[in-house]
A protein has these predicted regions:
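Single conserved hydrophobic/aromatic residue that forms the stacking wall/gate
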Residues: 1-7, 11
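Amphipathic alpha-helical scaffolding segments comprising HEAT/armadillo-like alpha-solenoid repeats
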Residues: 5, 25-36, 59-70, 94-106, ...
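Hydrophobic, well-structured mid-protein blocks that either form specific transmembrane helices
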Residues: 29-83
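A mid-sequence, solvent-exposed acidic-amphipathic segment
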Residues: 73-108
Length: 179
């Protein structure tokens, strides 16, 4: 069966993201195309897979880090998700881990999908850099929803030791009761 026009539009937009990441072109053109692509993201699937394919970022981390900052603090859920997914895909490295953790602490997610991206990023940071990530989790800088989802992702991870999982469980926050 032929896909619906809405599904076809999603596939076309996702393909634009993949092409932007894979095509050989000058860095400035890739950045222009990435900027145009961010405006089209209105779904997690349009964000997550294409972002991980933006391999050109690894040769231009400082420039891309600066480019992502307005998106992190934009207050727009999918712009925030884009920026956070870019951080976890390309910046969880020895050189950037401290900045990534600070960004995760400072961003105020504007909706569920942004919050889940921050939780995912924190869990990836913990799996790779547990000692550096502990202060963020213990310090109360994440909102309750993001904190608890990060903890759940860490506990579910196969890359985290059992004793770390036990420690992380102690940091769960009670859910607010709805009246």
């Amino acid at each position: 069966p032929k896909p619906s026009s809405a599904a076809s539009d999603v596939y076309k937009r996702q393909l634009q993201g993949y092409v932007t990441g894979a095509a050989r072109m000058p860095f400035e053109e890739q950045m222009d195309r990435m900027t145009a692509y961010v405006r089209k993201i209105n779904d997690w699937a349009l964000c997550d897979s294409p972002c991980s394919g933006f391999k050109f970022v690894r040769k231009h981390r400082e420039e891309v880090w600066a480019f992502l900052q307005p998106y992190l603090y934009s207050g727009e859920v999918f712009s925030q998700r884009f920026a956070v997914v870019m951080l976890l895909a390309h910046f969880v490295t020895d050189d950037f881990i401290d900045r990534v953790l600070e960004a995760c602490a400072a961003v105020r997610p504007s909706g569920y999908y942004a919050s889940m991206a921050v939780a995912w990023a924190v869990s990836v940071c913990f799996a790779k850099y547990p000692e550096k990530t502990r202060p963020l989790l213990a310090g109360g800088r994440l909102d309750d929803e993001t904190q608890n989802k990060a903890i759940q992702k860490i506990v579910d991870s196969f890359r985290v030791a059992e004793w770390d999982k036990s420690w992380v469980r102690t940091l769960r926050r009670p859910k607010e009761r709805k009246s």
